[in-house]
C-alpha cells in the first residue's frame, strides 16, 4: 500500500511540482527522500536553498512522514536537529495530505512562523519582541548555511 502511494506522489510531484520545491528518492529506497526548498522571497530566508529529508513510515499514508531540515535554519519552529514543529506532521496529519502539501506548508511556515507553539522558545521570544533582530539573524544564518 505505502509503496504504491509513494510512487503515485512521486509521479504527481514530477508532473506538477509545488512552487520553489523539489523532492524525490535519495537512491533506490522509495521510503527515503530528499527535498529542496527555496527560501520564500518575502521572508528572511530569501535566496537560501534548504535541504530537507523525508522518511516515509511503512504504514504511510496512515502515519505522517518524518520530515527534517538538514540545512541549519534560524526559526522558532525548527530546532538545531532540524526537527519541525508543524501540526500536519503530528496530530493534524491526514492520509489525504501529500508530500507536495507538506512542502508547501513548510514554505509558508518559513514566511509565517508560529511563535505560540515554538520548538525553540528563545527564537520565538526574539521573533515576538524584536522582529528586526529576528529577521537579521535569520538572514545571516541563511547566507552562512543555505547559500553556496
Swiss-Prot record:
MF-aspect GO terms: ATP binding; ubiquitin conjugating enzyme activity; ubiquitin-protein transferase activity
Pathway linked to the protein: Protein modification; protein ubiquitination
Gene Ontology biological process terms in this record: protein ubiquitination; ubiquitin-dependent protein catabolic process
InterPro entries membership: UBQ-conjugat_E2_core, UBQ-conjugating_AS, UBQ-conjugating_enzyme/RWD
Keyword field: ATP-binding, Nucleotide-binding, Transferase, Ubl conjugation pathway
Reactions it catalyzes: S-ubiquitinyl-[E1 ubiquitin-activating enzyme]-L-cysteine + [E2 ubiquitin-conjugating enzyme]-L-cysteine = [E1 ubiquitin-activating enzyme]-L-cysteine + S-ubiquitinyl-[E2 ubiquitin-conjugating enzyme]-L-cysteine
Keyword ATP-binding: yes
Residues forming the catalytic site: 85
Transferase in keyword set: yes
Tissue: Ubiquitously expressed at very low levels.
Catalytic class of the enzyme: transferase
Domain UBC core: 1-147
Enzyme Commission designation: 2.3.2.23
Any Pfam family: UQ_con
Family affiliation: Belongs to the ubiquitin-conjugating enzyme family.
Subunit structure: Interacts with RGLG3 and RGLG4.
Role noted for this protein: Accepts the ubiquitin from the E1 complex and catalyzes its covalent attachment to other proteins.
Name under which the protein is recorded: Ubiquitin-conjugating enzyme E2 30
Native source organism of the sequence: Arabidopsis thaliana
Amino acid at each position: 500500500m505505502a509503496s504504491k502511494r509513494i510512487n503515485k506522489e512521486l509521479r504527481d510531484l514530477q508532473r506538477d511540482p509545488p512552487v520553489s520545491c523539489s523532492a524525490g528518492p535519495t537512491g533506490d529506497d522509495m521510503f527515503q527522500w530528499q527535498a529542496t526548498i527555496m527560501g520564500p522571497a518575502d521572508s528572511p530566508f530569501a535566496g537560501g536553498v534548504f535541504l530537507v529529508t523525508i522518511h516515509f513510515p511503512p504504514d504511510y499514508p496512515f502515519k505522517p512522514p518524518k520530515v527534517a531540515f538538514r540545512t541549519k535554519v534560524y526559526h522558532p519552529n525548527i530546532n538545531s536537529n532540524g526537527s519541525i514543529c508543524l501540526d500536519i506532521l503530528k496530530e493534524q496529519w491526514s492520509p489525504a495530505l501529500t508530500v507536495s502539501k507538506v512542502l508547501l506548508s513548510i514554505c509558508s511556515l518559513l514566511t509565517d512562523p508560529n511563535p505560540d507553539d515554538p520548538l525553540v522558545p528563545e527564537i520565538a521570544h526574539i521573533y515576538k519582541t524584536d522582529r528586526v533582530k529576528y529577521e537579521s539573524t535569520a538572514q545571516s544564518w541563511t547566507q552562512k548555511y543555505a547559500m553556496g
